């Protein structure tokens, strides 16, 4: 994803925002680590990181999900949990599938 930065914002501001929010299934990676699908297979997590673009005031966001879990099925369970006041990760926070 390519995004233009707002005036006065930088990558550090954006990373701090997501780290403070502490979303249940959204994890921002440290340093310059590129997210890999192998890290999210069989989970409901979305791993992402933010990088500077070669064009001034633009950033690149790279994210990965396992579309079998984080896709429609996992999203439906997560939304149901929120609607019925269950823990957001109920039924979704389990060990990943074995190869």
Give the role of each language-model region.
Residues 1-62:
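C-terminal substrate-binding/catalytic lobe of Rossmann-fold NAD(P)-dependent oxidoreductases
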Residues 47-99:
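NAD(P)-dependent Rossmann-like dehydrogenase/reductase catalytic/cofactor-binding core
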């Amino acid at each position: 994803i390519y995004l233009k930065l707002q005036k006065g914002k930088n990558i550090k501001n954006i990373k701090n925002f997501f780290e403070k929010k502490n979303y249940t299934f959204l994890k921002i990676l440290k340093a310059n680590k590129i997210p890999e699908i192998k890290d999210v297979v069989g989970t409901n997590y979305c791993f992402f990181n933010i990088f500077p673009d070669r064009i001034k005031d633009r950033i690149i966001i790279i994210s990965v999900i396992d579309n079998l879990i984080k896709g429609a099925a996992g999203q439906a369970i997560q939304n149901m949990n929120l609607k019925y006041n269950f823990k957001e990760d109920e039924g979704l926070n389990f060990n990943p599938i074995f190869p």
